[in-house]
Design a protein with these regions (language model features):
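Gly/Thr-rich phosphate-binding beta-strand-loop-beta motif of the actin/hexokinase/Hsp70
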Residues: 1-15, 48-53, 157-175
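Helical "lid/coupling" subdomains associated with nucleotide-phosphate turnover
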Residues: 23-33, 37
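Generic structural signal for well-ordered secondary structure
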Residues: 7, 14, 29-33, 45, ...
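Active-site neighborhood for divalent-cation/phosphate handling
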Residues: 49, 53-159
Length: 175
């Protein structure tokens, strides 16, 4: 895509045994890895790098306000300090990430920052399934944020960016 954007060139959908994933948790790692392998073979691609996503139910997110202009290391310290207030687990039990969203609504030299935390085993299970399928995870996202990012990519390709159109993003889920 011109302008350095992304596009979906191929995709695959594979059925999982009923017991493979329960309540968003991988219960049968080998069954999930095998489904990933089958799908990957159908894609006929040489890349081994993938982006993964966690269900929103497995992630705690919170928007916080921090002073604007912090260096990366200062920002990390502040985020960890704030995260202790909102995450009901010890920080060594979670994977923690953050994204500066932009200036806070107060506009008083503050930034709005989104923090996201998930239990390490939730992240590690998904990474293990990808690795068991011979792939390397480069990105871990939240399903709803990944869907929004995909939607924005599609919207940007619509005539007039979809202005004056009704556009829906539907997540039908699975059971």
């Amino acid at each position: 895509v011109s302008g350095g954007g992304y596009r979906v060139e191929r995709y695959a959908v594979e059925a999982l045994p009923r017991d493979a994933v329960t309540d968003g948790n991988i219960a049968n790692l080998e069954a999930v890895a095998e489904a990933i392998r089958r799908g990957w073979r159908r894609l006929n691609t040489s890349t081994r790098f993938v982006a993964l996503a966690l269900p929103a139910s497995a992630v705690i997110t919170k928007k916080i306000i921090l002073p604007a202009g912090l260096r990366d290391q200062e920002l990390e310290v502040q985020v960890e300090s704030e995260a202790n207030q909102y995450i009901p687990f010890a920080l060594d039990e979670v994977n923690l990430d953050f994204q500066v969203i932009g200036p806070a609504a107060s506009g008083a030299d503050e930034d709005e920052v989104l923090i996201a935390a998930s239990r390490k085993e939730k992240v590690e299970d998904r990474v293990a399934a990808a690795e068991a399928a011979g792939l390397k995870a480069l990105v871990m996202d939240v399903e709803s944020y990944a869907a929004l990012s995909a939607f924005e990519l599609v919207q940007a390709q619509l005539p007039g960016h979809g202005e004056d159109k009704i556009i829906a993003l539907v997540d039908a889920g699975a059971n």
